[in-house]
Amino acid sequence: DEWRYWQADLLMERGRDDEARSILLALMQQRGFYPMVAAQRLGEPYPLRVEKAPGTISSTLTGGAEMARVRELMYWNQDNTARSEWANLVSSRSQTEQAQLARYAFDQNWWDLSVQATIAGKLWDNLQERFPLAYKDLFTRYTSGKDVPQSYAMAIARQESAWNPKVKSPVGASGLMQIMPGTATHTVKMFNLPGYSNPVQ
């Protein structure tokens, strides 16, 4: 997508507007950043496709032993083990069932599992389950009165952690925003934030 956009840009620069327009029109039919920019450049509305999870989730999916294990593990905050069970459950299902599982996880506020199901099922147009507005109250509270838009902070968290609050990178970054312990300590001191005592928080 990127090279096609820049090819059209170069053609426009050289006065070959018809060729450039043809490339941009074709490009804007795709999903992604450059297709959106192509539509914007042409002054056309971007045809955003949003899929909805199909119907009610099957009781065989929610009532099975695999889902019972996931629910139990999530209840006892054994999130990493639950994620492993979830990955096995999702990978063994059809795309329709994966969409239903993504929706089920979304409805349970298991946002990271919802995201995981959309990725496993390549459900790129299931935007609500793929990009849930997770932890919205938390982000509202901590971005209020700051020069950081809430949507930007949430986008960073989604990108960094896929909404898994317990994820830890190989280099030690952790949490929704994937903050390094040293950065957390420095930020607390710089802004005199109360209630922080160690990197485990």
Describe the function of each predicted region:
Residues 60, 73-76:
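Loop-to-helix junctions at membrane interfaces in multi-pass transport proteins
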Residues 1-3, 7-10, 14-26, 31, ...:
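Catalytic glycan-binding domains that act on GlcNAc-containing polysaccharides
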Residues 45, 62-63, 112:
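Acidic, proline-/serine-/threonine-rich low-complexity intrinsically disordered segments
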